[in-house]
Amino acid sequence: MFAVIKTGGRQYRVVPDDVLEVGKIEGEVGTIVQLGEVLMLGGDTPQLGLPTIAGASVAAEVLDHKRGPKVISFKKRRRKNSKRKRGYRDEITVLRITEILADGKKPSVGPRPKRVKAEPAPAADAAE
């Protein structure tokens, strides 16, 4: 099953376990957010929203908040000794799609546990 969602003015086709970068969404890293603007649900019986599907949502886990690549805007007026250079970086949220929910259901999957690196055992015998 797939869904077409809209967030930040853009549309994304998603399936469970997809990882995607979207415009900044409020939420702590590791929490589950619900994206409510579902434009289409696909599968055995596709549903099209007019403009959205009532009661449908997509649950996603926030993996990271970061900044996108630098975009430089440069304008030059020839022979006028005039130029302007500006740059900016977008705020980006990295999401992992956990579930596609229809008919107003609540997400059943909680955030995944964080991986803990195993610490090496102390080498007490080697020091003696």
Curated annotation (Swiss-Prot):
The segment annotated Disordered runs over 104-128
InterPro entries documented for this protein: bL21-like, bL21-like_sf, Ribosomal_bL21
The processes (GO biological process) annotated in the record are: translation
Q: Does the keyword Ribosomal protein apply?
A: yes
GO annotation, cellular component aspect = cytoplasm; ribonucleoprotein complex; ribosome
Record key words, sorted: Ribonucleoprotein, Ribosomal protein, RNA-binding, rRNA-binding
Q: Where is the composition biased (Low complexity)?
A: 119-128
Give the source's domain of life in one word.
Bacteria
Q: Which GO terms describe its molecular function?
A: rRNA binding; structural constituent of ribosome
Quaternary structure, from the entry: Part of the 50S ribosomal subunit. Contacts protein L20.
Q: Which family does it belong to?
A: Belongs to the bacterial ribosomal protein bL21 family.
**Job of this protein:** This protein binds to 23S rRNA in the presence of protein L20.
What is the name of the protein in this document? Large ribosomal subunit protein bL21
Origin species: Rhodopseudomonas palustris (strain BisB5)
Q: Which gene encodes it?
A: rplU
